[in-house]
C-alpha cells in the first residue's frame, strides 16, 4: 500500500468508531477519544508516516475535536517512566561511545569461545551484562551484538545467501536474536516496551512496578531461557561447524585493535554498576528510577563519555519521548473517562465460570501469538495491553501480577516472524536464514519460551510474594 492508502485506512477506522452507537456508560468525549486512540494505533501499525508523526496526529485530532484539552493532551510527557527510558537511551549511547560493550563481548569470546555453542553463550552473556542500561534492544542488538556476530560468521567463511550460511552464521544469528528478546524479560530498563507496560499499568490501575519487582518476576524464566535457548536452537537448527578454536585468536585481534582499557570505559563501567545498585535498592534509598538514570547520564557527561551533542543526536530517545508520551497520556485519560472499565466489565461478564488464573493463561497466549499481526512489540502492547489487562483485573487477577505477566509475555512473540520487533529485521536481513526457516524455528522457540515465561514467571512472583 502507498502512503495515501495507509493514511486513508487509518482515518477510516477512526471515523467508523466515532459514529458507532455506544453505551450511555461512556461519555461522548470518552468514546471520541477511543476512536482517535484506536486510529493512532492503526497508524502505528500501517505507518503511513513515522510513529512520532502519527502520535502528533493523535494529539492534534483529540484537541481539535474538543475530546480533551491541550493540558490533558500533553500530560503524558510529564510521566516519570517516559523520561526514565529517554534518559536510559542517552546513557546507553555512553556505553556504545566508550567501546565497553565490544570489549565485554570480545573478552568473553576470547575466554570461552572454543565451540559454536560456547560462542553463543558468550554472546548471550554480553547481551545480559549490558541490557540493564540499554533500554533499546534494537540499539543493543543492532549496534553492539550484530556486528560482532557478523564478523565471527565471516571469519569462519560463513557467507549469507549461499551454501555456507549454515556453517555457523545461521545458528549465531538466530541465537543472538533470540537472546536479545529474552534479556528484556529480566530487567525493567532493558526494553522500551517494558516501561510502556509499567507506565500504562500505573495510569490504568494506579500501581507502580518497581525495578526490583520486575527483576523478581523475570529472573527465573529469563535465566532458564538464557541457559536453555542456545542449546535448544543448537539441537533444532545446528551449525555445521561445531568447534571454533580460531575464535579466540580473532577476538584477541579485535581486543588488540581496541587497545588497553580506557578511562572512558572504566568510568562508564563504574557508573553502570552504580546505576544498577541504585535501581535495585530503590525500596530503601527512595530514589526514583528516573532520577537514577538521569544521574547516570550526567555522570557520563561529567566524565567525558557523553556530550550534549551526543544527547541531541540520539534520535531514538527523542522519538520515544514523542510517541510514548502521547500513548501514556491518552491511555490514562481513557481509564479516567471509564472507557477501559466498561470494556473490561463487558468481556468479563462473558467469561463467567473461568478462573482468573486460567483466563490469564489463555489471554497471555492470545497476546503472544497476536504478534503475527504486528510489526513491532510496541504496537502490540499499545493495541492490546490496556484492554487485556483490564479484563484480567475485572476477573479478579491481582494488579501487580497482571502488569508483570504482560511484561513477561513481551518476549516470546518476538521470534515468530521476520518483522516481530525493531531488532528482528537486522538479524534476518543479514541473509543467513531463509524466511520460511525463520518462521518455523521461531515458532518452536516461542512455544518453549511462552511456557517457561508463564510458569517460571508465576513461580517467581509466588516465591517473592508478589502473587
Predicted ranges, named:
Residues 1-2, 24-32, 44, 71-80, ...:
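Interfacial loop-to-helix junctions that mark the boundaries of transmembrane helices
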Residues 8-16, 38-42, 60, 64, ...:
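Generic alpha-helical transmembrane segments of integral inner-membrane proteins
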